[in-house]
């Protein structure tokens, strides 16, 4: 019965015990109601007392045998003795009083059953000193409840005998009244008692024998000690006294207790925060401190929700009091920038000012699209740069060069100022810079390192249209601070700077306001210097060497003089411009533009040195004889015949650099300002060439730009 808790309810299991209880209680009740009153008057009043005591004793033992734990062994846990479960032998042998007794492995309970223990197939439990499973009490009979079962049998047998005997006595005393109700009920109770007396008396006698011999029903039925010696017997009297008078065996199963429900918070859940003092430890850039702040639960939740959507805070400012070297460096850099920036010059943004720059060397060819490919030029070999000169010619490049000293040219250090006006062709128009001691060989050396001053607006147009040719890969001048050269020590601030955070239109409008203040200057003569082929590809170096051989073999062509109009052609001396003369659009754009389709001719390579008598126009300044106002987008997208002032030997020397991988047929480039050729009077197109641009209507010229854009330029 106690083992049935927690299992499925089976009504059939309670039929025998219910029937036994009904017959026992019902028959005894009838006996006390109809027979005992007459017997108490006729025989003795002790008869009902005796029967009542016996009946209570029967009920007590019946209840104890039914509801008491028979001595169930608890089962092993699932993770206990797994090795024994798989590897254990079927039996183990122990010696009791010199006799070998086997202990069998129980696969259900997962342990070796002790001696005299057996597994009940009905209760599905291993019971200590298992006797049998009695259906009349609906429980196993084991060591702990065998006493009560045995006493139940004895008391029940005695009670049945008493009921039957006292009933027979009542009938004999009232034989004249056999037809009476009392006599009839007494006779019916005697029949029931007589029917139960035979099996109960037989079972009681059987167990008396077993107790006297010290055996169990299971041992007797299975014949374990048949023909042998029982090691568990202690003699008849000892066996009886052990069953009836010994102390009860301990209980192996704990008493069933109600399970308590405990709510356990997982470790990742934050405990509830009550209103109170919260110690907050702050760590800010190495500065530690403890603040005691009063925060409520609501304020913390609001802060959490805000911090989840907010941007991460900016890095803290450095503590200048702790780092004296950094403070000195920042103060010197601030003073230098304040002295370099003129009154009319735009301020350099802070993040741009201290951004590290990388000089273009071998990495320029490897990464032509890198925005860190910058070109810087050193001071002149002939004219030293002073603070006053640098204040008049600021470079707007404050970042240091990270290139090793072995790869630096002694002329590096000053950046080229960018002027979108003079960058009309595919490669930037070459213009000689006054006041800088560059020679032709030095420019070729810079050019051999793969650097060029391609127009920022031109490259922006290429990038916007998504067409980059092989030439643009060799000329990676895509950084915003790739500036053009400011010529000569002029009092006015230079105009080549374009802020990287401004659009091209705003930058051109700002330059248009400063444009008329530039004065024309003339460049000095330069001497050639040897050429470096360090970072060029193998086929370009081979073709360049072949061209130099041809240059040494063929004499320079005579009769080519610079025409006066060439002085204002807007030529700008930029290193690496001989790589590929290119229009401001890509090769695909030049093929699409109807204004740039001319027969293949030799590219116009301007001379780097000009006579001192010829004065070049100031950077981006208008023509000396023109009064047309400056237009923001005055870039030339057409090509023209090369000027006659350019020597053929220089063209031959620069031809190896004009071989793109995408097989773009390079057109002859002619620099133009405001859509008009600079030396249009001296250079006329060939007989088979189409017009340079669309016809001028009423002083307005239409020029096709990138992506099919048409620009109207007043002449």
Curated annotation (Swiss-Prot):
Topological domains, Cytoplasmic: 1-13, 74-148, 213-715
E.C. number: 2.3.1.225
Reactions catalysed according to its record: L-cysteinyl-[protein] + hexadecanoyl-CoA = S-hexadecanoyl-L-cysteinyl-[protein] + CoA
Chain positions found as Phosphoserine: 247, 296, 299, 345, 380, 398, 406, 409, 415, 425, 429, 432, 529, 554, 621, 684, 694
Compositionally biased spans, kind Low complexity: 359-373, 422-432, 581-597
Organism: Rattus norvegicus (Rat)
Keywords, in A-Z order: Acyltransferase, Cell membrane, Immunity, Innate immunity, Lipid transport, Lipoprotein, Membrane, Methylation, Palmitate, Phosphoprotein, Transferase, Transmembrane, Transmembrane helix, Transport
Matching PANTHER family: ANKYRIN REPEAT AND LEM DOMAIN-CONTAINING PROTEIN 2, PALMITOYLTRANSFERASE ZDHHC5
Domain remark text: The DHHC domain is required for palmitoyltransferase activity.
Gene from which this protein is expressed: Zdhhc5
Entry's Gene Ontology molecular function annotations: palmitoyltransferase activity; protein-cysteine S-palmitoyltransferase activity
Modified residues (Phosphotyrosine): 91
Protein family (similarity comment): Belongs to the DHHC palmitoyltransferase family. ERF2/ZDHHC9 subfamily.
Name of the protein this chain belongs to: Palmitoyltransferase ZDHHC5
């Amino acid at each position: 019965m106690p083992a049935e808790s927690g299992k499925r309810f089976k009504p059939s299991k309670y039929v025998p015990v219910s029937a036994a209880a009904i017959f026992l209680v019902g028959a005894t009740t009838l006996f006390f109601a109809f027979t005992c009153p007459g017997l108490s008057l006729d025989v003795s009043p002790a008869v009902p007392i005796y029967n009542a005591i016996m009946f209570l004793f029967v009920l007590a033992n019946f209840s104890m045998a039914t509801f008491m734990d028979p001595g169930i062994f608890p089962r092993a846990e699932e993770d206990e003795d797994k090795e024994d479960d798989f590897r254990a032998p079927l039996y183990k042998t122990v010696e009791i009083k010199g006799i070998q007794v086997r202990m069998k492995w129980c696969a259900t309970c997962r342990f070796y059953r002790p001696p005299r223990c057996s597994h009940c197939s009905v209760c599905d439990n291993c019971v200590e000193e298992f006797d049998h499973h009695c259906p009349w009490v609906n429980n196993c009979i084991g060591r702990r409840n065998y006493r009560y079962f045995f006493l139940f049998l004895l008391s029940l047998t005695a009670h049945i005998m008493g009921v039957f005997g006292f009933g027979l006595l009542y009938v004999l005393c009232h034989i004249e009244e056999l037809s009476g109700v009392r006599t009839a009920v007494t006779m019916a109770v005697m029949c029931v008692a007589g029917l139960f007396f035979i099996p109960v008396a037989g079972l009681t006698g059987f167990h008396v024998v077993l107790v006297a011999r010290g055996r169990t029903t299971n041992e007797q039925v299975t014949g374990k000690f048949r023909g042998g010696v029982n090691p568990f017997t202690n003699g008849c009297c000892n066996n009886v006294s052990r069953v009836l008078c010994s102390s009860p065996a301990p209980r192996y199963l704990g008493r069933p207790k109600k399970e308590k429900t405990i709510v356990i918070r997982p470790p990742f859940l934050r405990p509830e925060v009550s209103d109170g003092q919260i110690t907050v430890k702050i760590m800010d850039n190495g500065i530690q401190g403890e603040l005691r702040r009063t925060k409520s639960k609501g304020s913390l939740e609001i802060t959490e929700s805000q911090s989840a959507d907010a941007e991460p805070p900016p890095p803290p400012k450095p503590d200048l009091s702790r780092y004296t070297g950094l403070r000195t460096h920042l103060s010197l850099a601030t003073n230098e920038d304040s002295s370099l920036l003129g009154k009319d010059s735009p301020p350099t943004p802070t993040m741009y000012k201290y951004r590290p720059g990388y000089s273009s060397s071998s990495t320029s060819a490897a990464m032509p699209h890198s925005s860190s490919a910058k070109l810087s030029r050193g001071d002149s070999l002939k004219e030293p740069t002073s603070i006053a000169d640098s204040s008049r010619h600021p470079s707007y490049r404050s970042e240091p060069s990270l290139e090793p000293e072995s790869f630096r040219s002694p002329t590096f250090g000053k950046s080229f100022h960018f002027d979108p006006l003079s960058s009309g062709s595919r490669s930037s128009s070459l213009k000689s810079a006054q006041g800088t001691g560059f020679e032709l060989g030095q420019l070729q050396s810079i050019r051999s390192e793969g650097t060029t001053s391609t127009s920022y607006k031109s490259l922006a147009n290429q990038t916007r249209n998504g067409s980059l040719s092989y030439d643009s890969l060799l000329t990676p001048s895509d950084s915003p601070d790739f500036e053009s050269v400011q010529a000569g020590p002029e009092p006015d601030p230079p105009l080549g700077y374009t802020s990287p955070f401004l659009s091209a239109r705003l930058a051109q409008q700002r330059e248009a306001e400063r444009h008329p203040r530039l004065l024309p200057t003339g460049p000095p003569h330069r001497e050639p210097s040897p050429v470096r082929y360090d970072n060029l590809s193998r086929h370009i170096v081979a073709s360049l060497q072949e061209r130099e051989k041809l240059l040494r073999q063929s004499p320079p062509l005579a009769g080519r003089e610079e025409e006066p109009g060439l002085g204002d052609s807007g030529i700008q001396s930029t290193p690496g411009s001989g790589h590929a003369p290119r229009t401001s659009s890509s090769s695909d754009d030049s093929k699409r533009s109807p204004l740039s389709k001319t027969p293949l001719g030799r590219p116009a390579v301007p001379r780097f040195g000009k006579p001192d008598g010829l004065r070049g126009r100031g950077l981006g300044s208008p023509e000396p004889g023109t009064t047309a106002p400056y237009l923001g987008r005055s870039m030339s997208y057409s090509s023209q015949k090369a000027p006659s002032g350019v020597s053929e030997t220089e063209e031959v020397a620069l031809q190896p650099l004009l071989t793109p991988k995408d097989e773009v047929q390079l057109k002859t480039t002619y620099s133009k300002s405001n859509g008009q050729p600079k030396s249009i009077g001296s250079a006329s197109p060939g007989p088979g060439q189409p017009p340079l641009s669309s016809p001028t209507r009423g002083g307005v010229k239409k020029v096709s730009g990138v992506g099919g854009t048409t620009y109207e330029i007043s002449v």
